[in-house]
Amino acid sequence: MTGRALAAHLATLALALAAPPRAAAAEPPAAGEPSLATPPRLKELVPAELPPGTSFPSPEVTVILSLEVGASGRVERASVESGTGEPFDGAALAAARRFEFEPGRLASGEAVPVTVTFRMRIREPAPAAPPPFRLAGRLLERGSREPLAGVAVVARSEGQVLARATTDAEGRFAVEVRTSSFTLAAAPEGHQRLEALVKGEPGETREENFYLESLGGPNETVVSATPLLREVMKQVLTAEQVAVMPGSSGDALQAVLNLPGAARAPFGSGLLILRGSAPGDSRVFLEGQEIPQLYHFGGIRSTFAPTFLESIEFVPGNFSVDYGRAQGGIIDVRVRDPSPLGFHGEADVNLYDVAVEMEGGLGGGWSLGGAFRRSWIDTFLRAVIPKDAHLSFTTAPRFYDFQFIATWRPDPSQRLRLMFYGSMDRVVALLEEPEADPTITGTFDALVSFYNLQADYLSALSSKLRQDTSLVLGLQEVDTGLGPQYFFDLKLRRLAARTSWTLELSPVLQGRAGIDAEVYGADVSLNLPNAAGPNPVPPSTLPQIGTTQYVVLYYPAAFAELRIAPFPSLSFLPGVRVDWYSDIRRWAVDPRLLMRWQVGPTTVLKAGIGLYQQPPEPQESAAVIGTPDLLPERSLQVSAGVLQTLAPGVTLEVTPFYKALDRQVIPNANANYDPSQPRYTNLGTGKIYGVETLLKVNLGDRFSGWLAYTFQRSFRTDPPSPQMPFDFDQPNNLTVLGTYQLGRGWSIGARYRLISGNPDTPVLSSIYDSATGVYVPVYGATNSERLGTFWALDIRVDKVWTFKDWKLTLYLDTQNVTNHKNQEDWLYNYDYSQRTELTGLPILPILGIKGDW
C-alpha cells in the first residue's frame, strides 16, 4: 500500500489479550440486575498512521489503550493507560477512535456501553525493496530454432523460488526478481534441462535467448555459470543511478562522460572527445539517427531530456558496422516508450532550468508522452558577470528543448514509434573593443537549433527474422554574426533512412545486413577570416573569405555482419561497411572484426580490430572555400580487454587500445599566398594509444559507484611540422564517484576528477601591424606547453518524500564545491607582453525540487 505514512501501513496491530476484549473491573452485579453476556468484538482493524521517517526506539512498540465502546459499537472515549510517547501514542489513539465493534450485549440481547483494554503493537517497517531485475527470454530448440511453448520456467536462489513463468507460443517468458543473482531452470519435455546462473543489476531489463538440444532419451541437466547464449554485453546505467549521480545534474548524457575514454572538454563547451579523437570525429545517435547537437550552451544540459531515455550505449572505439562516417567513437541513445498504463508526469524546477513531462496510455495499443524544458539562467547571469568585462548581454544565453513520443504496439511482434523532438539555443551580446583587436566590436549574435521528425518501426517477421527501420526528416539552423563584417548562416535539411535485417540461421550462425543513407540540402552564407594555421591571430590581419551557395550531399551506405559462435562461450563478429561520399566522390570500405570469449564464470575476454573512415568537413571539401578532391580521413583501431568479476557486485574492466590515423585533412598555409595551391590536403597523420580502466562497485542497495582511469596519449603530425601532442591530449584522466543511500529518503553522492591540462602553444613575442593597428603574436612550438592540472570535487544531496499518490524530491547538486580555480587558457594583454590565467566556472550549486506522479 502507499499513503501518507508507509511505515504505519506496514505496522501490525494485535489485541493484547488472548481472550476477547474484557470489560473494566467493576463490582459484581446485584441479584436481579442484568449481566454482560457478550463482550464487544472488533469488526474492523484500523492501522496506526505514523509520520514519514519516524524513528523507532525498538523493533516493536506497544501502546495499551482504554476504550469505551458505546451501544452503537463505536469508540466514544479513548485514553492511553501505558504508552511509549509520541508519535506512537497519538497514532494509536487516532486509529482506535476509528475502530468499529459488535457492541457488548446483556443476556437479554440489549446493547450496552462497555469499557475494554487493548494492547496495540506497532512494528518497524522493513526497508524498501530494490527495483526488480527483469529478464525477458525465449526458449528455443538448438539447431531448428523452433520455440518451446508451454514450458514452466522457475527463478530460484538458495533453494527458494523467486518467480515462475510459462513460455508462450513463441517460447517467450518474463520473470522479475529482486536479487542480483539467481538460477533460471526449465525442463522441457524431450529436451535438455536448463539450469543457468543469471546476474543483473536492480532496475535492469534484459532480453536473452536460451537454446536447448532435443534428446532421444531421458532429460539431462546442463549447468552453466552464464546463460547458454548472451546476445549483448554492455555497461548499464540505470535511471536510479543517473538521477542521483553527483556532478551530472541528473542528465544521463552528462553521466556517461564519467566513463573511461571520454576526455574533459574545456570551458564546458560540450565537445565530445573520445579516445583522443578530434571533437568532430565522434557521433551521437538517437535510436540510430544522428543528433546534430548534443549539448546546450555551457555543456551542462544535453539537448534530449533524460525523462524518456532508456539506456545509453557508450562506445569510445571499435564500434560495429552499423555505424560509420566517424573515426572516433559513438554514443547511441535508446528511448523508452511512454507508459501505456494510467497517467504519469514529472515537474522539475531548479536554479538552472524548469522541465515538465507527461505520459499515458490512449488505448488500442497507443501510448503518448511529451516533455518540455526551458532554461532561466539568463535571469541571473548578468549579476555574476564582472562590470569590467568587455561584454554585455542584450539576450543572455537561453535554451529550450522538447520531445513528443507516440508508440503503437498492435501485438508483441510489432512496434511503431513516432517522435518529434528539437532544441534551440540563443544569445545576443554587445562586445566592446578588446585590447587584442579593437576592430572586433559590435553585436555578437548566435542561434543554434534543430528539429527532427523520426519514425521507427520494429517487426518480427518470423521467429528467425527481424527487421528494424528508421526514417528521419530534420532541419538544422546555425545563425551567427559578429558586427557587420563577420557572419555564418546555415540552414541544413536532412533526410535519413536506416533499415536492417537480422536472421538467426542457427545457434552457431546469425546474419545481419542493412542500409544506411543520408541526404543533405544546405543553404550556406558566410564571410569569415581565412585562418590557415593552427594558432589564432587577430582576425583583422587575415584576409576574408566569403561565399553563398546551395549544396546537396548524399551519403549512402550498406553493411553486413555475421555472428559466429562455434561454442556458447566464444563468438566472432566479422563485418564490412561500404560508404559513398558524394562531396568528394569517393568510396570507403571498412572491414571490422570483434571477438568475445567467456573464459570462465567470472572472466570475459574481448578484442576488436577495424578500419574507420569519415568524409572531410563540408567546408573543407566545398568547391569555393575548400578542396573538392580530398580523400576520406581514416583510422585503424585495435583494442583488447578483460572483464573480471572480483567479488559479488565488484567488477574490473581493463582495455588497452591503439589507433593509427592517416589521410587527415589539414589546412595548407601556402594557399594564403598562392591561390593555385589547395586550401586543404590529406597529409596529416597521427597515433593514439592508452589503457582504459573501470572498477565498478555495487554493494547491495546502499552504495554504488566506480573508479574510471584512462591513461592516453594522442599525437598528430601536420607536415612540414614535426609530431606534436594533439590539442586535447590528456595523459591522465581519473574520475571517482559514488552514491550512498542513507535511508529515510536521504542519499548523498560525491565525484572527484583529476585530469591533465590540455596542451598549449606559448606566445614568445609580437609584431606590430601598422596597417591594422594591432599586435600579431609570434608563437613558439605548437603545443609545447601544458595548461594547469584540472581537479574538482562535486557533491550531491537528495531527499525524497513519498506520499500516497506522488513523490517529492529536494536536491542540491554542487559542482566544484571547493571553488578551485581551474585554468582553461591564457589571457594576453594587447601586445602579448603579459598574460594571466583564464579560469573556468567557479562553484556551481544547482538547487532544485522535483515532483513525480
For each feature predicted by the language model, list its residue ranges.
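Outer membrane beta-barrel strand-and-loop segments of large Gram-negative receptors
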Residues: R494-S500, G546-V551, L631, G649-A708, ...
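Transmembrane beta-barrel wall of Gram-negative outer-membrane proteins
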Residues: N350-R374, L391-V427, D445-Q467, L505-Q510
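Structural signature of Gram-negative outer-membrane beta-barrels, strongest in the C-terminal barrel
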Residues: Y421, L492, T502-R512, D516-E518, ...
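Charge-biased low-complexity segments
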Residues: A25-L162, D168-A174, S181, E195-A196, ...
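Periplasmic N-terminal accessory/gating domains of Gram-negative outer-membrane beta-barrel systems
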Residues: D168, G190-Q192, V198-N209, E220-S320, ...
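C-terminal beta-signal and adjacent terminal beta-strands/loops
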Residues: R753-V774, G788-A792, D798-W853
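Gram-negative outer-membrane beta-barrel transporters
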Residues: S571, Y658-A660, T681-L764
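Surface-exposed extracellular loop regions of Gram-negative outer-membrane beta-barrel proteins
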Residues: R426, D523-P538, I584, W597, ...
